[in-house]
Amino acid sequence: MDSIINALTSNNFQRTNTPISKPLVVHAVAGAGKTTLIQNLLPEHPNLAAQTAGSPQTPNLTGAFIRKLTCPESNKINLLDEYAALQPLKGSWDVVLADPLQHPGLALRPHFIKSVSHRLCPATTRLISKLVCPCTSSRTEESTIQFSGLFEGPLLGTVIALDQTTQALLTAHGAHFLCPTAALGLEFDTVTVVSALPLEEVADKVGLYISLSRHRSQLHVRSPPPHPSH
């Protein structure tokens, strides 16, 4: 367990005032590196076993990879990624990790948190901070972020429809789209988010957060004004 806590500290996860208990709870925003941290720990520590309630890694020859969720392994320190997808959490896990902003259920009180994203650009984290929850970016380069009215711009890249109104509209026009839950865990170079409401009026903060954090290079938003500053 010391190796895990040392890795969290060295990767700038911040200790909270919650007393250490089992399971050790780690929360991080999208792109903060929690899954990468697990990936880096596994080859060096054969006493660790990692599973995920999200998308498992491809198996490799070493056996050091994040597996699909089954149950904790005996005689191992067991880590569970994306635990917040499970309601309720079951099993005797030693460490559980998640971005709780991507799931609607109640999360556990964390022992470590990280609100700095290495994938999302500063403009994106400012936008998410304004609309959902405070976070920052370690990047210096900006992505392209562009807003226009619902019918005033093209649908570029992967389209994410935030609500039933826009989903029905896109379906009627034969346009392919994802709902926020289908986009969970995925990344795309270019994303267009479509909303029937101004983003500041969207009540589904989980869906909004997922939608605004899927792009790598370009984010386009098609929604009624006013459009948030970023």
Swiss-Prot record:
Function statement: Transports viral genome to neighboring plant cells directly through plasmosdesmata, without any budding. The movement protein allows efficient cell to cell propagation, by bypassing the host cell wall barrier. Increases plasmodesma size exclusion limit. Acts as a suppressor of RNA-mediated gene silencing, also known as post-transcriptional gene silencing (PTGS), a mechanism of plant viral defense that limits the accumulation of viral RNAs.
Query: Start and end of every (+)RNA virus helicase ATP-binding domain?
Result: 1-114
The residue range of the signal peptide is none
Q: What else is known?
A: TGBp1, TGBp2 and TGBp3 seem to act together for cell-to-cell propagation. TGBp1 is the main movement protein that physically cross the plasmodesma with the viral genome. TGBp2 and TGBp3 would facilitate TGBp1 function.
Q: What is this protein called?
A: Movement and silencing protein TGBp1
- What does UniProt give as GO cellular component? host cell cytoplasm
Keywords recorded for this protein, A-Z = Host cytoplasm, Host-virus interaction, Inhibition of host innate immune response by virus, RNA-binding, Suppressor of RNA silencing, Transport, Viral immunoevasion, Viral movement protein
Question: Where does the (+)RNA virus helicase C-terminal domain lie?
Answer: 115-230
